[in-house]
Each structure stands twice: as structure tokens, then as C-alpha cells.
């Protein structure tokens, strides 16, 4: 009997970031349209990131954005990718995302991470040097608040005394917890304390290959042999008639986004040897993003699935300044011309 083909899921990463001076009310309506279209086209998940004080970009707040999506959609999973957990207190976060899980009827994926921008830590009055401790303590408290009637514990800057989460989560025991991580120690931490690590879009494929081995060893050490049931990779994807057109079409938008990443200091938390997002566009995209025709992009995804055991592929297709029609055209092409080829080819 032939082995069953692995299941593969496809998600959409919508950063919800736009240039200064853009028509933000109009863009918000377009993002809601993109979410509804993603569900109609059969995408499995819609992911929204989180940053604060995002000059030179506008960025919609993650919690309010996902809350709105609970009403705009009915089936697609809603991924918080990621909550900057050290900036917050556990009761606040537990209650916010319990509400989202309840309002969506159990469609939340709770993604967390440390963050890397000094402006955010300073704005929230949090010392960056204690971020790892805060992440772990906050996550422990949130899990307990989601699963216990009363919680008594202390953490950095907060104290719970018979505290509870005012709204119950729908998923049992709680929504999936994913950790976004760039550096090797953070990946090892994800293996230890999260349900899954979701692979960032910034690193070259050779770096990703090495870090997946780091993750596997850390899972083994944590008593969790093998990859998680849902192993998610994020990649920037641009599909067009051919690779040259995709390369040209995406250039002004990806350049603007990665220039902002570089200025924000995203590079500083990436591994040595692959920690410069200020490269020229031609060098930046090489062996990092997926560009090409539907056939070419399908082949690239199939290769990543087969090499790394990925079974949930989240695609970044919306970048600051990109016209709405360009985003929806690409979504349509992915759903109609890429997803079937990938499912047939794996």
C-alpha cells in the first residue's frame, strides 16, 4: 500500500503595514477584503504580526485587528504572529487572546516572541536584559490562567493572587503556542517551552537548514523526539508570469520593508553569517525568498516541504506600498495555480 501523502496547509502573512501618508482607512477596508478572500480561496490561516511605534510605517494593532477578523471570517485560523510577550503582563494577554479564541470559536493560534526593538522596550518601561525571564514567566502564567480556576504566582513586575482569566478559551487545554525565534538559543527555548517553533522568513535557506537541525536536537533533549505535528515556515513569496517579472514587481515593496527591518535592528538578533538585511536587493532575495512562475514557486515549496518536514507554509505577499490589486491577484494565483501543484507534488 502506498504511503499517504502528508497534509499541507497554506497560510497568509498580512503585516498590515503601510507607508506614511497612505490612505489608512481605505487600506483597512482592503485588508478585511483580503482576509475574506483568503478564506474563500481556501487558505488555512491568516497571520498578523505586532509592532509598536513603527515609524516610518503605519501598523494596525494586532489585538484589535484579529478581534475584527473573528467577525469578518468564520473558518480560517487566526494566527498571532507574534505577541511581543515581555512587553506585557500575563492577565492582560491571557484575557485578550481568550476573547479572540472565544469570539472565533476556537480558531486562535497564539504565537509569541521576545522582540528586538529598543524603542518598544523603552516605551513599555521594560528592561530588555530581562526579556527572556519575562517571556518564560509570562507564558507559564498565561497557560495556567487558561487551564486553572485560580492562579497564585509571581513574576517580573507582576503578582497573581488567586487570579483568573475572565473569559474561558474554547480550545482545550488551550490554543496552540508557537514561538517565533531567530537565534539558536531562542530556537532551543522554543523546543523546550512551546508547542512549535515557526521558522522566520528572514534567514537564507542554508541557515534555516542548519537551525532546523538545532531545533530537532533541542526537541530530543526536551523529551519531544521528532518534529511537531504542525511545523510552520514563513517565507516571502512573489508569484508572477516568470521569475524576472516577480523580481521586478516586488522590488520597491520588499526593498522598503527590509530597509525598515534593517533600521529597526532585526539583523541584530539573526545568526552570525546571515545577519545583514541591508544588502542590495539582488543579494537580499537570493536563496531567501520564493520568486517565480506558479510552476517555479510550486517546485520551491515542494523542495522545502520534502527537505525540512514543513507541513504549514505561511506566505508573506503583502508589503508596504503594494497595491491591493497586486496582493489579491497573487492570492488568486497561489490558490488556483500553486496550491494544487504542491499538493500533487509532495
List each model region and its residues.
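Acidic (Asp/Glu)-rich catalytic clusters
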Residues: 2-5, 39-40, 66-74, 97-108, ...
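An alpha-helical appendage that flanks or caps ligand/catalytic pockets
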Residues: 2-6, 12, 130-165, 204-311, ...
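Flexible, glycine-rich active-site loops centered on histidine and acidic residues
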Residues: 5-26, 86-157, 197-209, 213
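Conserved, mostly hydrophobic/aromatic
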Residues: 38, 42, 69, 100, ...
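Alpha-helix-loop-beta-strand connector modules within alpha/beta enzyme cores
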Residues: 59-80, 134-138, 331-346
